[in-house]
Amino acid sequence: MAKPATILIKLLSTAGTGFFYVAKKNPRKTTEKLEFRKYDPVVRKHVQFKEAKIK
């Protein structure tokens, strides 16, 4: 069976709340770390989310 092309990553809030989203990423096509501006319900604002490893 072949290795899957996509991996799961964690998008961690930079507000320091510990809130995160889980997303898929193809590491062969997207080599840089992902950054998104998404909603953090803990602080009730849109903040920057950065890629982190799922442990």
Curated annotation (Swiss-Prot):
Biological process annotations from GO: translation
Keyword flag Ribosomal protein: yes
MF terms (GO), sorted A to Z: structural constituent of ribosome
Keywords: Ribonucleoprotein, Ribosomal protein
Gene behind the chain: rpmG
Any one annotated GO CC term: cytoplasm
PANTHER family linked to this entry: 54S RIBOSOMAL PROTEIN L39, MITOCHONDRIAL (PTHR15238), LARGE RIBOSOMAL SUBUNIT PROTEIN BL33M (PTHR15238:SF1)
UniProt key word Ion transport: no
Gene source species: Paramagnetospirillum magneticum (strain ATCC 700264 / AMB-1)
Record-given protein name: Large ribosomal subunit protein bL33
Family matches, as SUPFAM superfamilies: Zn-binding ribosomal proteins
